[in-house]
C-alpha cells in the first residue's frame, strides 16, 4: 500500500481545486451504531465523545487514538467527525437479575422496567415491551430477547440501553453506501477510518475513496498480512494500486485501531 506522505503529496500536486487546510486535519470515524439518529456528529474532544459513547465502544477507542496523536498536517486535530452506518434492527439480551432496573432510550424517550423476584429473560422482555408500547415507526417484538426494528428500512432513529441489556446491531447498508451518505451530510473531513476489518468491506471502502478527494487509513490483524500471502487486504490493494489507502498491521488491530 502507498505511504501516507506519498498520498498527501499526490493530492497536493494533482488537485485542480484546493482542499481547505482545515479538512486535512479532520478525520472521519465510520461505524455501525444507533447512539444518535443523524448521519454525523462533530466532536471537539474525547470528553464530548464520551458523552455519547461508552469507553468500551469502538467509536470511543478510535476517537481516543485520534485525539491522542497529531494529524496529517503535524498538529493535534481540532475536531473529528463520527459517521453512522444505518442499523435497522437491534436485539437486546437481558442479563437476568432480581429487583434490577432495565432501561431503553428510544428516539430520546426513556423506558424502564424493574424486575421482580424470580426474574427470567421472558419476564424482563415482557415488562420492557409493555413499557415501550407501540412507538411510531418502530416494531417491538421478542420473547427472551427484546427486538426493536424500524418499520421502514433506512429510517433514521436512535436507541441505547442500560449495560444489563446487551445489544446486537443488524445492518443491511453497505459500508460504501454509508460512507457516501455521511459525506453528503458533512464533507469537511479528509481521512477516513472505519471499524470494519473484514477484507471485502475494507476493499470496497478503498474503491469508494479512490474516487473521492480523501484518503483511507485501515488496520489489520490478519496473520497473512506480514507474509508473502495473497489473501490479505494489503496484497489486494497493492495489486490494484490503491493510492488513496494506507494500512497498518498489528496483532491487536481489532481492539486498538492503530491506523
Task: Please tell me what each predicted stretch does.
Residues 77, 130, 183-259:
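A glycine- and small-residue-enriched flexible loop/hinge signal that marks low-structured segments
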